[in-house]
Amino acid sequence: MREGVNKVALCLFEHNEKAYRAAIRMMDQYGKAAIAHSTGTGKSYIAFKLIEDNPEKVVIWLSPSEYIFKTQLESLKRNDSDFPLVNVHFYTYAKLMCCTQTQLEEIAAQKPAYLILDEFHRAGAECWGESTVALLKLCQDAKLLGLTETNIRYLDKNRDMAEELLDGHIAGDMNLGEAVVRGILPAPKYVTTVYQYQKALAKYQARVDNLRTPGIQDANQKYLDALRRTLEQADGLDRVFAHHITNKSGKYIVFCANKEHMDEMVSHVPEWFTGVNPDVVVYEAYSDDPNTDKAFADFKTDISDRLKLLFCIDMLNEGVHVEGISGVILFRPTISPIIYKQQIGRALTAGDTAAPLILDVVNNFEGLTSISGLQSEMQEAVHRLYANGEGDKIVTERFEVIEQVHDCRILFERLQENLSSSWEHYFSEASIYYAEHGNLNIPKLYTTPSGLSLGVWLVT
């Protein structure tokens, strides 16, 4: 029981309880700890547990957005409306960036016992990092607890933010694959397909056209033509959705790249989704829209028989979970591994048992293999658990992946392999020329003794 309140103390999932205890030990020893747990595993409750266990201590909570913190609080209040938050002060990383030195000193003057860095990999952003580090220097007596799905900034030279901000003290580390293997998150039904692939075909046609050796060009053109024919014969999105969206009145989050992209996708709703349910309602949520709060709230409370689609841009990537989601639909270009995992993670929530649907709809062929990263994580987790004598913790070793365009992926991989070997062939000839002549000042029309148009290759 919580002291002075007729309430039972917060009860963490086993994986979070273990990480919390390790974090307490690390903070006592080093003053800082990081927890890198997959999206959907409830890691914000680790921070709430820290607050509950230290009700008299001042806590400063830093987060990428007010929206994330607000939804985390909503989830907490559903479980415990009297949770003690009087000593918790919330700021966004963006707010810190706008603070003067005096304002940062005023924040530090609250003398926090703890600083919680939520989604702390985001503090590595150039615009946010400096002010965050400045505040940490002003709060040197505070213990630091960092929460993230991954501490690596993949598109920023693989910077390790746990190392930079928390001296590499990681109290808990569990990626999405391990969370699924251990049954903490439900295994999804994963469907891949492509749409609007004409630009991608044109890009590869240009690469094939630039191959000046007839034999090599002809071989690659055959693969590309076969890929084009296979794509033309594949089911359209209307058939894919009608077949795989089995909960006809379910709630689905639809991720888009930007506002223009979202508007275009929404315009296709009648064409693509009427075969699922002719009664479709569309909600839209994006950070610059003042109506977002209402749209999001209406989506969450909608219990009608309509098919409910929440189209959104980036704001639901991290930290925000919606109960009762039947699945997610990703309309996406190539994105970072972090955002990809966060988006598919919106369909996965600890404690759920039903297999959620993930429809991965890509406009580039490279995206067809994205799921292999998660599958590799799962295989590594299975091997590690068996090796550690923890085979009893394995609940799921694999999940269903339905490739609507399986043949396309195989043809694309062969085309990629062929184009790469062609490049290596040209590179090898260029290396030979350089070794013989000491430079690559090759006339554009120069061909090698074997017939390669090396001059043209070098200028293209």
Feature-to-residue mapping (PLM):
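Walker A/P-loop
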Residues: 29-49
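Conserved Walker A/P-loop ATP-binding site and its immediately adjacent core
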Residues: 44-49, 53-76, 257-260
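SF2 helicase catalytic motif II
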Residues: 107-146, 152
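Interdomain helical connector at the RecA1-RecA2 junction of SF1/SF2 helicase-like NTPases
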Residues: 156-252, 266, 270
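Conserved helicase ATPase core of P-loop NTP-dependent helicases/translocases
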Residues: 280-313
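Conserved SF2 helicase motif VI
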Residues: 336-352
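Conserved segment of the helicase C-terminal RecA-like domain
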Residues: 347-373
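IQ-motif-like calmodulin-binding regions
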Residues: 402-460
